[in-house]
Amino acid sequence: MSEAEYLGGRLLLAMPGMGDPRFDHAVIAMCVHDEHGALGIGVGHVREGITLHGLLEDVGIDPGLAPDMPVLNGGPVETARGFVLHSDDWGGEGSVTVNGLCCLSASLDILRAIAEGRGPSRFVIALGYAGWGGGQLEGEMRRHGWYAAQGRPEILFETPTGRRWTQAWKREGIDPAHLVGQTGSA
């Protein structure tokens, strides 16, 4: 793939019938994609039983001014590892810009900043990530497992979690009700 074809900063939308129930109606914010592989954070499903306040308390941070919002299921890899996708108005150590979609941070510094009311203005927090080895995601794309939508911050930060998949399709001009789960050949 050429650099222009890599999917960093895009939203991957799971196609109906992709065959992996872990990714049913998944929305993945793609953070890194190159010849060595890809890493994205799932933003379409809530991790049941975990809220931001509980997560902060688990890592020894007083929730303070943090909103008690759901934590998202970021993916099936390293499910105890936390990631914050956020607006670019906070730039602590280790914060990385993801091609205009958002910034990515994975340090306790951002969690402390959020709890103290000095964090980013917009953010989502997830545990785990989705990862692919070199060429693996490209193969899944060829098999119609994923659709690469434009990376729209309003889908990530303003759309309720359970509506992100449908709204991302609609912003692409596609009615997801018309999608089929299988392809055929003539």
Curated annotation (Swiss-Prot):
InterPro entries: AlgH-like (IPR003774)
UniProt signal peptide: none
Pfam families documented for this protein: DUF179
Gene3D superfamilies referenced in this protein's UniProt entry, alphabetically: VC0467-like
Domain of life from the UniProt record: Bacteria
UniProt cross-references to HAMAP family, sorted A to Z: UPF0301
Family per record: Belongs to the UPF0301 (AlgH) family.
Protein name: UPF0301 protein Saro_0683
